[in-house]
Amino acid sequence: MAKEYSRTQRIGDQMQRELAQLIRREIKDPRVGLVTITAVDVSRDVGHAKIFMTVMGQDSAEEIAQTIKVLNSAAGFLRMQLAREMKLRSVPQLHFHYDESVVRGAHLSALIERAVAQDGQHQEGSASPDAKPESTEE
């Protein structure tokens, strides 16, 4: 049986695809790098949409904040372009947010790899469970 998605999820999925193309094609500001739209959450009344995004190659908080500021200032233009592409009675207001889950996921992955490596070193340093301890008595 096919999964059933709510209307807001379908709108969010389409907005994610359309916004990715629009930003790449229409936004020529040099402060906007390679933006990836990771998710779009549309409110139930379809009045607002939170757009979660990451920027490749921009790691500092200042660069990311600048990109978000540029995208939020271009939100009206992007909304107008979305209205042309999507067949909706009203297009939601766009609010751009930085998606920290990607950075958090990479950090957790690095922590897990480090813990596994330390565990492997610890096991190599200890005696095998079948070996008998050497006696130091003479």
Curated annotation (Swiss-Prot):
Tell whether Cytoplasm is among the UniProt keywords. Answer: yes
This protein's assembly is summarised as: Monomer. Binds 30S ribosomal subunits, but not 50S ribosomal subunits or 70S ribosomes.
Q: Which organism is it from?
A: Pseudomonas savastanoi pv. phaseolicola (strain 1448A / Race 6) (Pseudomonas syringae pv. phaseolicola (strain 1448A / Race 6))
- MF (Gene Ontology): ribosomal small subunit binding
Spell out the subcellular localization from the entry: Cytoplasm
- Upper lineage: Bacteria, Pseudomonadati, Pseudomonadota, Gammaproteobacteria, Pseudomonadales
Functional summary from the UniProt entry:
One of several proteins that assist in the late maturation steps of the functional core of the 30S ribosomal subunit. Associates with free 30S ribosomal subunits (but not with 30S subunits that are part of 70S ribosomes or polysomes). Required for efficient processing of 16S rRNA. May interact with the 5'-terminal helix region of 16S rRNA.
InterPro entries according to UniProt = KH_dom-like_a/b, RbfA, RbfA_dom_sf, Ribosome-bd_factorA_CS
Q: Check the record and name the Pfam families matching this protein.
A: RBFA (PF02033)
**Which protein is depicted?**
Ribosome-binding factor A
Keywords per UniProt: Cytoplasm, Ribosome biogenesis
Show the segment(s) annotated as Disordered: 117-138
